């Protein structure tokens, strides 16, 4: 969690209506450029600062978003970790209102939409795009399941009918955001738009509803603490061991099948 940021300190809670995607607009796919751990660790975070720096990589320029000087903030990021793998990192609680899309004539989607920022590369690497697209869809599917969001649905926001899953450019077109092109300027090169995102997220939800998954979280009812859902018990145990003593592995019947506590 980027607890040192102005957004984290100054925002307020929101009623969650949907998910909004951004992309960074800069050629740097590394999450460490934007995300660094706080000096003071939240109690619920089992990772130390040094451990997070090992995972993320250190931003030697100190120009990440976890500072009071930066006047923006989102709920999660998707990009490369220090080892080159693709992952999602949550930086604010899901119900914290982000400062991400600005505002328009009808208001702002900062009020109601969990916002994800995807780290851009040169926009020419199809393999990277495929991986981050998949990761962002899976994260969005998780959010939709957690908060009962219909991925292909709509909500009425300030009198306007708005899709539950949108991007920054969508928010502008609907009168709820500033005029940024993301994510269409990138996605269109690979034949994707937000309709595809909604369909792919819905497909993931349908598939995971069918699959028998092992979920790693603190308690069966604490969905916000979940760090992953796995088809393999061995992989779930590995993730649980890394997460800390408070975490357990639950099967599809909500039964504890592994716990770090002896």
Task: For the regions a language model picked out, list residue spans one by one.
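Active-site-adjacent loop/helix surface patches within enzyme catalytic domains
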Residues: 1-152, 156
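Basic/polar, cationic surfaces and motifs that engage anionic cell-wall
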Residues: 9-13, 122-210
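Short, flexible beta-strand-to-coil junctions
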Residues: 23-28, 81-82, 217-221, 250-255
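Local beta-strand/beta-hairpin segments that build beta-sheet-rich folds
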Residues: 91, 225-227, 257-258
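Short acidic, glycine/serine/threonine-rich helix-capping segments at coil-helix boundaries
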Residues: 156-164, 225-231, 250-251
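Short aromatic-glycine-(Arg/Gly/Cys) micro-motifs in beta-strand/loop hairpins
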Residues: 210-225, 248
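A short, charged, amphipathic alpha-helix used as a generic interaction element across diverse proteins
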Residues: 231-247
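Short, mixed-charge low-complexity intrinsically disordered segments
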Residues: 245-262
């Amino acid at each position: 969690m980027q607890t040192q940021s102005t957004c984290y300190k100054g925002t307020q809670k929101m009623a969650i209506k949907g998910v909004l995607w951004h992309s960074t607009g800069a050629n740097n796919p590394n999450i460490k450029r934007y995300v660094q751990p706080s000096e003071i660790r939240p109690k619920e975070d089992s990772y130390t600062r040094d451990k997070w720096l090992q995972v993320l990589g250190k931003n030697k320029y100190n120009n990440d978003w976890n500072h009071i000087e930066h006047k923006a903030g989102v709920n999660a990021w998707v990009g490369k970790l220090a080892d080159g793998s693709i992952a999602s990192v949550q930086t604010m609680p899901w119900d914290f209102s982000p400062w991400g899309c600005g505002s328009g004539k009808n208001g702002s989607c900062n009020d109601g939409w969990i916002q994800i920022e995807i780290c851009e590369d040169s926009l020419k690497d199809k393999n990277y795009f495929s991986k981050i697209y998949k990761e962002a869809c899976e994260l969005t599917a998780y959010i939709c399941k957690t908060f009962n969001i219909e991925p292909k649905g709509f909500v009425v926001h300030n009198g306007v009918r708005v899709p539950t899953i949108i991007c920054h450019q969508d928010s502008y077109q609907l009168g709820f955001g500033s005029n940024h092109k993301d994510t269409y300027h990138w996605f269109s090169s690979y034949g994707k738009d937000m309709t595809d995102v909604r369909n792919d997220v819905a497909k993931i939800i349908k598939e995971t509803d069918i699959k028998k998954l092992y979920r790693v979280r603190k308690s069966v009812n604490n969905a916000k603490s979940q760090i992953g859902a796995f088809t393999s018990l061995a992989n779930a145990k590995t993730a649980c061991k890394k997460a800390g003593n408070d975490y357990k592995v639950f099967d599809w019947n909500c039964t504890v099948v592994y716990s770090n506590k002896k």
